[in-house]
Amino acid sequence: MASAASASASAVVTPSSFRCVPTASCGLGARGKAPAPRRLLHDHAQGKKRAAATWSLKAGLWDSLRSGFLKSNNSTETVEPPSAPIEEEEPLPEELVLLERTLADGSTEQIIFSSAGDVNVYDLQALCDKVGWPRRPLTKIAASLRNSYLVATLHSVTTPSKAEGEERKQLIGMARATSDHAFNATIWDVLVDPSYQGQGLGKALMEKVIRTLLQRDISNITLFADNKVVDFYKNLGFEADPQGIKGMFWYPRF
């Protein structure tokens, strides 16, 4: 499920929500509720409290680009910025158990989604090697993570059946997004360990990323998709070249 600069798509989506099992460090505990069943935790409820919404890309994108001006009676009025800078609240990280299962040796494996952005660059490089991505300088990988608006991860955490065994934690998936923190976000570097593909984890990761961006009031969501994964993103609600809008690229020619 790697994302590459091949074909562009823009999202007008409202992702399905998840029923989640909060971890101890999450701080989003479901008080008094029994643990969720050991399966991929999709919520198939009808969502009565939240009406489905779609965003018009033409209105949303272009309105955001011209949002510094108001037109009234054929005159243009400049919108004055606030007198004091508005401090942006730091979004609280989210950590959820998406899947829990017992392995053949009796150990327990949990697949944990996190938006805390805690990624070891060496673990990420190893994951990129597994999916066949070309290696990039570690300093640039670290900079890309540091400068991202959102970094979401999937970790496999295995707890042995015997108390004396050590817990094992492995990075198995990641996606990140850059943003102007107001209107637009672009999703990059979506990847899942090949040994964990085909289990719905890539879809779960993307839906959580989209939902997190929507919760932060980011409604114009774009990405670049390799031809092999265009259908995957279309099934999530992304649209290629909406209303004739084309992605354009500039490359150095030296």
Curated annotation (Swiss-Prot):
CDD domains: NAT_SF. Disulfide bonds: none annotated. Its EC number is 2.3.1.87, 2.3.1.-. GO terms for molecular function: aralkylamine N-acetyltransferase activity; L-lysine N-acetyltransferase activity, acting on acetyl phosphate as donor. GO terms for cellular component: chloroplast; nucleus. Pathway: Aromatic compound metabolism; melatonin biosynthesis; melatonin from serotonin: step 1/2. It catalyses: a 2-arylethylamine + acetyl-CoA = an N-acetyl-2-arylethylamine + CoA + H(+). Keywords: Acyltransferase, Chloroplast, Melatonin biosynthesis, Nucleus, Plastid, Transferase, Transit peptide. It is found in: Plastid, Chloroplast; Nucleus. PROSITE patterns: GNAT. Residues 1-83 form a transit peptide. Catalyzes the N-acetylation of serotonin into N-acetylserotonin, the penultimate step in the synthesis of melatonin. Catalyzes in vitro the N-acetylation of tryptamine to produce N-acetyltryptamine, 5-methoxytryptamine to produce melatonin and tyramine to produce N-acetyltyramine. Acetyltransferase required for geminivirus infection and systemic spread. This is Serotonin N-acetyltransferase 1, chloroplastic. It comes from Oryza sativa subsp. indica (Rice). The gene is SNAT1.
